[in-house]
Structure formats: C-alpha cells, structure tokens
Amino acid sequence: MHKLGIISFLFSCLFLFSCGTNKEKIVCYGDAKSNLAQLLTDEGYQLQFCSSVAEAIQKAPEQSPVLLLAPSYPEKGTVVTSEDLNLIQSKALRVFMDYPQQIGKNMCVKTDTMVLERVVVCDSLTPQLPAMSLMCFHRCILKEFDQAPDSTYLVAAKVAGFDNAVYGLANTPVHPLLYQQNNQLMVAATSVSNFATSRYLPEQRVQSMFEYIMNWLLQKQDVTFSSWPTYVSPSYSATEQLPKDAGKQSIAKGVEWYYNAHLLVHPSWKKDWADKYMGDGLAPVGPELPADMPDGDGSLGVLEGHMSSIYYDGKQQYRYWMRDDVQGESSYAFAAAGDLLGKQDYLKVSSNLLDYSFREYRDSVRNNPKSPSYGLLGWAYTHKGTYYGDDNARSILGSLAASSIMNSTSWDKQIVECIVGNFRTTGKNGFRGGNILDPDLQKNGWRHYFNSDLVNLHPHFESWNWACYLWLYEQTKYQPLLDRVKKGVSLMMAGYPNDWNWTNGIQQERARMILPLAWLYRVEPTDQHKQWLQFMTEELLKNQVACGGIREELGDESKSMFGCTPSNDAYGRTEASLIFKNGDPVA
C-alpha cells in the first residue's frame, strides 16, 4: 500500500508539472508549419488551427488571443471581412494577423517588394527595440492600404545607418509594416511568421519584436522565449574551448563551401546560368543555382560568389561574374586545403584554376609580346581591357602561393610576366594608380606610365603590387624593383594618416600595408623598415577586441572613396563601409 501511495504521488506530480508547462491556448489560422507556430508550440502554447479565418474567430472564446497567419506567402494574403471585424469587436478578441489582403472593407491597394528598405522602429518598444533601431526583413513583400492605422510601430524605409536610422525618417518614403488597426487588431504588412526561414535579422531584435507582439496578444507583460530557431549560427560559443583540430576543421569546411554553393562552373550549366546572368558585367546578378547542379573542376573557373541580397524565402542572390582575382585567390584556397587534407581533387582544381586564369584573362593583346598590355591580366571576363593593379596583385599572390604548395613551375613565366607588366606601368615614385584602360595603354605605351610622377597614397591600390615586386626582386635582384617600392613606401608612410586615401575603411588600408612592409624588411632588414612594420602592425591592432576580431574604422571623410553615407537618399547607391561610425562592432 505504501508503494502504491508513492507511485500515485509521483504521477500526481508529473501531471501537475506537465500542466504547468502548458501555456495559453491560441486559436490560429494559416500555416501550421511556420517558424512562429513551431516556436510557440515548443514554448508550450496550445495552438488550435482552424480551416478559415471565420472559423477561427467564431471558435475563439471571448477576450482570447487569435493568430491569423498567411496561409501561402507570398501567393495568398490573409482576408478579414467586415463580419469578422464585427465579431472580433463584439467578443473583445486580441487578434494578430500578417500579410493582409483585406481588412473589412479596405482592400490591399499595392503589393511591393522591399529592396533597399529596412525595418525601422518608430517609437521605443522594448530595451532591444529603441526608437530608430533597425532590422532587416530581406526583400519581404508588403501589402499596403489607403486607410491610415491607429498606431504604427514599425515601418519599412530606405535609411542610412549601421543599426539605427541616423537621419531619422526624413526625406524618405515610409511604409507601415507593424501597426495596430484598432484596439483589437494588430497587423504585420508582410509575413513575419517564417522569420527564421526568411533570415530576418538581427535575431535578438526579431525575438524582442515577437515578445512584444505576444505580450500584446495575451495581455501580459512578462512573455519571453526560452529558445530561438535559427539556421545560421557560430560553430562554437564565445567561451567554448576549441578542439585541437579546430583550424583544420575550418579549412575543410571552408573549401567545401565552394561545392555547397556550386561556385565552380560546370559545362552543363555554364551557358544557361553563368553566361546568362553575367551578361555585360554591369549587373551580373541572378538566383542561386539549384541544389542538384553538378560542380565543375576549375577548368571553367569559379564564380565571384554571393550577393548580400537575400530573397523573401531566405535564398541568396549570386554574383555570376567571372573575375580574374577570384581565380588566383581560389586556387590558393584549394591548394592549401588539398595539401593539408591530402585531397588530390582539390589540388587538381587549383591547377585547373591557374590554367583557366592565364588562358582566359591573358588572351588577345595581353598575350602579344609587342603590346604594352603584354603580361597583364584582365579585370573580369566582361572587362578584359581594364587593368587594376590591386586585382592583378591578388591574382598573382594566389598563383604564387598555389604553385609553391604544389611545387610546380608550370606558371612561373606567366607570373613573372604579369608582375613585369604591372611594374612597367608603375611610375618613378612607385605608384600605379587605380586602373589603366587598354585603349589608353595602347595609345600611350607603357613608358608613359613608367616615367610618370604619379603619387597615389592609397594602399588599397598600391600595396600588394609592391609585395609582388619585392618577391620578384628577391628572385632576380633587379634593383629598380626595390628602388621604386622603397620610394613609394617611404612616401606612403610619411603621409600616414592625414594624407591617406581610403576605400571602404581605414583599417583595410592599414592591413594592406603589412604584407609589403614585411617583404621590405625581409629583403632589406634595416631598422627603418623594421620600425615601419612594427608601427603599422600596432596601428592595426589598436582596434583588436577580446574575441580576436579587429574592428573596422573610418578615416578622414574627405579622403574616402566610399565613406559615411551622407543621407537616406544616398543609401545603397554606391559601395560603402559596413559601419556608419567608429565604434560600430564590425570586424
């Protein structure tokens, strides 16, 4: 009898515990498999899905919560009729609906896709959602109505800023995104219920938004979520001890990314995908490749990669552009991974990429010994007559590293000819400038550039060519290579920081100086060269934070190519730094 009593007591405790974990019952309509439905179920809420909006509103007890979620986003919006509105009012329900097609007599008058717009918090909602803070609902599709809502919490607008709208909502169109239609009805103008699939960011703010919505829906003040669904997360936490082979694992994952993303061009899809979307190179953007597409072996090159643009369903756009610097850099990645991991397939891809690079981007006048363009590598498949020194240098640095790892001399001639081609278009002071166009080079001849007095205090464009020149000097002891680099580096260091030009951030410019300074000390180890290297390294590391990342920094705005975005209207028109002001946490 004593045992039966204990068992009965344990079952009672288990029953009470299970009851305690079940939270409010919520009547719902829409996609029962959505991220929001799954989250609420995992959190212990009891969701009762109905087959129609009318059924959900009719079945909901008075003063209870109702969720009306988009049944098929983006094809079909949610419809609430006038009868539904009347019943919501009479029963004093709290209703949240997303992606509305109709609200009473008001019909959606416009369906629009956000492109450059971000989500702006109008007034402070939570500590994580202060006024003017930003979220990204990537290319979400908005439903707009003529009738103004009672209260607007979030709007979609094209605004400048890193994590807040620094210029406010002035001089930019705004579109209500989360608002209260009346006391009983809160509306999201897009579908927010698949927030994880759609990769809405940042996650902490999206979570806080839903906690705010749920507190309103349940008429509470303490709703929080114990977990949060995500499809992208770090491999390790900030405090987790790394395994001994963490570096090796990261390299293995890094090179497999090329295959997971299908970046190696395959002959079966080259014409219908790579060539089609590359076009003339001005907007070489298209949808991601289907998951079942085969991967190439490097003999047709590697795509530039992903765009930052994400579609409403979480898929990401591709840059179907074929750039030569990508070929050289990727060949290095495959060679390093192949050597470390013992993967002959990776080494073969590396070799094929180098063959492709020198075959495809050194054609025509670039392969004619009598041409002033001889040895140079074209910037891209669509812009072979544009010669950026920094792009040539990136390709050559990758080629040098890959060929060294593979212990191959197959590309030595092309590598040296490319370095010389760049050097003979470098002026007396050691500077080459941004880019040289082939028509100008054919007209002027290479001596025009070799004898110029150009000074260009812009490491982005100059520094890695210097590293290439110094590498060639070490092999040949050809004195003009060293002399021109020393002249250029001396002027560059003397002009730091006030006279430096910068592209997307001053930290990137500092970082680019490390390699040529290291090579300069290697080939001529003087106290001055050592001091320069130490100084620039210390300048770079001033912004290193506890996790090891080196924070980006903006320089003198008057010296920038793409600096701080000056207005809401200017946002998204050009390249820009990832940060808006110094201190923004971006490495």
Segments the model singles out, each with a brief description of its role:
Residues 25-107:
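Helical hinge/lid and interdomain linker segments adjacent to catalytic or ligand-binding clefts
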Residues 62-64, 151, 365, 548:
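Glycine-centered loop/turn motifs
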Residues 73-151:
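A glycine-rich, often tryptophan-bearing local segment used as a flexible ligand/cofactor-contacting loop or short
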Residues 1-24:
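Bacterial Sec-dependent N-terminal signal peptides
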Residues 216-587:
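Glycan-recognition and catalytic cores of secretory/periplasmic carbohydrate-active enzymes
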Residues 32-33, 42-45, 60-61, 65-66, ...:
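Carbohydrate-active enzymes and regulators
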